[in-house]
Design a protein with these regions (language model features):
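Active-site-adjacent pocket scaffolds in enzyme catalytic domains
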Residues: 69-194
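Metal-dependent polysaccharide deacetylase catalytic core of the NodB/CE4 family, i.e.
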Residues: 1-68, 127-147, 178, 182, ...
Length: 194
């Protein structure tokens, strides 16, 4: 399917590291306890290169998309990610909600046009990468609710949700064909879908 352009396969960093934490030189916990450490960009680079190499060995090509571990992203990781050839990555709408647009305003994820639009993230050194943000509502319904419903009810709810997002875009004067609603699920949720 990937060779025919019907699906795009993504990679993840090897050994599932939380890259933003590895790129930081320490932080203070909510309770005030300080975590002292150096930034480990070489470790991040190693996880990325190893993951890309394994993907290519097994599948015969290098991916351009990435699912970061736990969907954790930060400006500091943009350059290491783009250095290995990644052009886009996926994260969660809660990350978008905590992000600012070019005018410095927090992004309203209740606005379908914001959530269903690929964004550009700028790295600490000026590099850029496209980021898509998963719609948590519909993704979590698939992961945790639809497995307990009849197939007909689950499909009806899914289609109704998509129609609602489409209508929100139309009401805002947007062309739905120019937007991307991202449904993304973690692997540990598969047991809830059967």
């Amino acid at each position: 399917l990937a060779a025919e352009g019907q699906v795009e396969l993504t990679t993840t960093p090897y050994y599932h590291p939380i890259m933003p934490l590895l790129m930081m030189d320490g932080w203070t916990m909510e309770d005030g306890i300080r975590v002292n450490k150096e930034a480990w960009p070489a470790d991040v680079q190693n996880h990325l290169v190893t993951g890309m190499d394994l993907f290519e060995t097994e599948l015969g090509f290098r991916p351009v998309g990435m699912w970061p571990s736990e969907q954790a992203v930060s400006p500091a990781m943009v350059e290491p990610v783009t250095d290995v050839g990644i052009q886009w990555m996926v994260s969660d709408e809660e990350i978008l909600k905590q992000s600012t647009d070019t005018s410095g305003q927090y992004v309203d994820v209740e606005d379908a046009a914001n959530l269903a639009t690929p964004w550009k993230a700028t790295g600490a050194e000026g590099g850029e990468i496209a980021v898509i943000f998963r719609d948590r509502v519909i993704s979590d319904r698939i992961a945790f609710q639809y497995g307990t419903m009849t197939p007909e009810a689950a499909v009806s709810d899914f289609i109704s949700y998509l129609d609602n997002v489409r209508q929100q875009l139309l009401d805002a004067g947007e062309d739905p064909s120019q937007h991307l609603l991202t449904v993304a699920l973690d692997g540990e949720n598969w047991m809830f879908m059967s």
